């Protein structure tokens, strides 16, 4: 029943890209070049398959609205069995997702898109640091991303085109940095 009416995308090399300390992987990307530009697929974990509307699990998740991360612990929006297990797009396992499948031309314009339920198989858990290192040609990053380098270069090329199109539209750019607290062994702030 789980796979009924889902598109099988397990042959596409989706990857997750998150921070080093991420524990749940709720989105994955795949990009291929087309004659007109790129096909970009963004998959998010299909939590709705496991959390039915109106259930106590659903009500609790609505109250929490998000997971809250502390330096050495987390208060998850969903039980860990879901957030880090069944709904986490871990590498090497098939997972139920909702996918946005978009075509983007060389001017950075989205020419077509559709949403659909799918099954994906993550081919790698990557970090922002490793991806950037690989794109810079550094040995550590290249070793870490391995055979995914070509896909990452396509994603980065698409990013460049989208960034240029955004600039052309004079869109606002909000530069933000993720904040983090460092604590000493005795739990005092450093």
Cite the ranges covered by each PLM segment:
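Electropositive polyanion-binding surfaces
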Residues: 1-189
């Amino acid at each position: 029943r789980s796979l009924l009416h889902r598109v099988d995308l397990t042959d596409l090399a989706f990857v997750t890209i998150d921070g080093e300390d991420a524990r749940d992987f709720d989105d994955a990307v795949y990009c291929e070049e087309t004659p007109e530009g790129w096909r970009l697929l963004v998959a998010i974990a299909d939590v709705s398959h496991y959390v039915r509307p109106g259930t106590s699990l659903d009500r609790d998740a609505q109250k929490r609205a998000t997971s809250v991360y502390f330096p050495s612990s987390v208060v998850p929006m969903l039980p860990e069995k879901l957030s880090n297990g069944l709904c986490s797009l871990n590498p090497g396992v098939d997972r139920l997702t909702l996918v946005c499948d978009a075509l983007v031309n060389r001017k950075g314009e989205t020419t077509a898109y559709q949403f659909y339920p799918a099954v994906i198989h993550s081919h790698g858990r990557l970090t922002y640091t490793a991806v950037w290192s690989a794109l810079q040609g550094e040995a550590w990053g290249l070793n870490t991303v391995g055979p995914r380098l070509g896909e990452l270069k396509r994603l980065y090329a698409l990013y460049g085109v989208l960034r240029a199109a955004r600039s052309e539209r004079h869109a606002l750019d909000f530069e933000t940095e993720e904040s983090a607290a460092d604590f000493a062994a005795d739990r005092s702030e450093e």
